[in-house]
Design a protein with these regions (language model features):
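Extracytoplasmic small-molecule ligand-binding "clamshell" domains
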Residues: 1-83, 88, 149, 220-223, ...
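Ligand-binding clefts/hinges and TM-proximal coupling segments of bilobed small-molecule sensing domains
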Residues: 1-9, 133-150, 187, 218-248
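Short loop->beta-strand "edge-of-pocket" segments that line small-molecule binding or catalytic clefts
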Residues: 16-23, 39, 117-134, 146-147
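Periplasmic-binding protein-like
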Residues: 23, 100-110, 172, 176-218, ...
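Ligand-binding cleft/hinge of the Venus flytrap
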Residues: 29-34, 46-56, 95, 120-122, ...
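Hydrophobic residues within well-ordered alpha-helices
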Residues: 49, 72-73, 119, 159-162, ...
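A ligand-binding cleft/hinge motif common to bilobed small-molecule-binding domains
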Residues: 66, 82-91, 137-138, 158-193
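Flexible hinge/capping segments at coil-to-helix
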Residues: 98, 107-126
């Protein structure tokens, strides 16, 4: 078996590259309003990887990050697009990140909260998207505030408003869009985390596939593919991640 055939067998043992696409992260993917088809940066990357491998691509769409992780870990998808997190890293081999986005807090206009330092206090309620990178992060970091989990990231702000919670946590762009849609809401000034978006596959697929995916992501960054995809899909505020120093 040639090196190329070994890589194809690693990524697409069925002959089709199945890519888990999380429609709950609008920075990476969404549904075309006219056709309903998935589109976005992650879709473009999946199709480009399939083109290079010479195989068809099947998009396995899900509505939150936890389902995307589950699909890859349990073999219902071959690759996925995830925020890097040590808990997920137990089962998934991540590449270096290709995009960096900000995790921020949103509050009601009349809230007394003015800074991130005021969030983690007894009695505060913070709404997050179940299984998201910021859910995992805040579950470790918040020691006093309570966490309420909305079913998906796009549902966070509506849940926050309906429950009259103190804080909504999420991706800056999603929070800004929801604040404009609903009104009388504002973001706290600073981010509470940088979310590193990477590609990944199950560790059970072996090191050769992980190394090949790492090279693919590095090429997508350095060639300008990721930057062009962000621009093409009108994504603002997300940054192309720097190249890893040890990338070759």
């Amino acid at each position: 078996m040639s090196p190329h055939d070994r890589i194809v067998a690693c990524f697409a043992p069925s002959g089709t590259l199945r890519a888990a696409i999380n429609l709950g992260n609008p920075i990476l993917a969404g549904s075309d309003p006219s056709t309903g088809a998935a589109r976005g940066v992650s879709v473009d990357l999946a199709r480009e990887l399939g083109r290079r491998l010479g195989v068809a691509v099947e998009l396995v769409t899900v509505d939150n990050a936890a389902k995307s992780v589950d699909a890859v870990v349990h073999g219902r998808a071959d690759i996925g697009f995830f925020a890097v997190d040590p808990l997920r890293g137990a089962d998934i081999a991540f590449t270096a990140p290709y995009v960096l986005i900000e995790g921020c807090y949103l509050v009601h206009e009349g809230s007394p909260l003015r800074s991130n330092d005021e969030v983690d206090r007894p009695g505060r309620v913070v709404v997050v998207g179940r299984g998201s990178a910021y859910d995992l992060h805040l579950s470790r970091e918040l020691k006093h505030a309570s966490i309420v989990r909305a079913p998906t990231s796009p549902a966070v702000v509506d849940t926050f408003v309906a429950q009259r919670a103190d804080v909504a946590a999420g991706v800056r762009q999603q929070l800004e869009a929801d604040a404009a849609r609903i009104g009388a809401l504002r973001l706290l000034g600073e981010r509470f985390m940088v979310i590193r978006q990477a590609m990944g596959l199950a560790k059970t697929r072996g090191s050769e596939g992980a190394e090949s995916l790492e090279r693919f992501v590095d090429d997508m960054k350095t060639s300008g593919f990721v930057a062009a995809a962000l621009s093409r899909h009108g994504i603002r505020g997300a940054l192309v991640a720097p190249r890893r120093e040890d990338a070759t």
